[in-house]
């Protein structure tokens, strides 16, 4: 939430597991993004997993910031972060660090807790500037 109490959100095209002990994730964001200034160390965020049924939410959070939360139901999670119950799951995390690289930044977050709301239908993947679902499993990693 902003200091004025407005919710903040954006679509991260890549969220990556960074470590398991402690549990860490990372994401990248353009420094010119309207959400960037709010991703300071100590800030709480909700990272939602998306599937084919929630593609609309990825598109909504990538739209103009004035429209991101219009006509969308969400609950107030820890530290008042927006949590969307329509998604398969959510990870609550705290920003550990922010490293600026050229006009972008790498955000490292500590995973605090997670919640599952339902089973994902078809996981959503962002690839070559478009949304896709996963295809056939090619090989197990033994």
Indicate residue ranges for each PLM-predicted region.
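Basic, polyanion-binding surface patches
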Residues: 1-142
């Amino acid at each position: 939430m902003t200091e004025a109490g407005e919710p903040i959100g954006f679509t991260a095209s890549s969220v990556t597991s960074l470590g398991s002990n402690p549990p860490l994730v990372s994401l990248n964001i353009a420094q010119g993004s309207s959400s960037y200034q709010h991703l300071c160390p100590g800030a709480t965020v909700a990272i939602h997993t998306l599937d084919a049924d929630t593609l609309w939410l990825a598109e909504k959070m990538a739209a103009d910031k004035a429209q991101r939360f219009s006509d969308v139901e969400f609950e107030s999670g820890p530290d008042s972060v927006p949590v969307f119950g329509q998604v398969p799951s959510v990870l609550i995390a705290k920003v550990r660090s922010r490293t600026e690289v050229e006009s972008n930044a790498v955000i490292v977050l500590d995973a605090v807790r997670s919640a599952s709301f339902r089973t994902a239908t078809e996981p959503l993947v962002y690839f070559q500037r478009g949304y896709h679902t996963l295809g056939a499993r090619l090989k197990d990693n033994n």
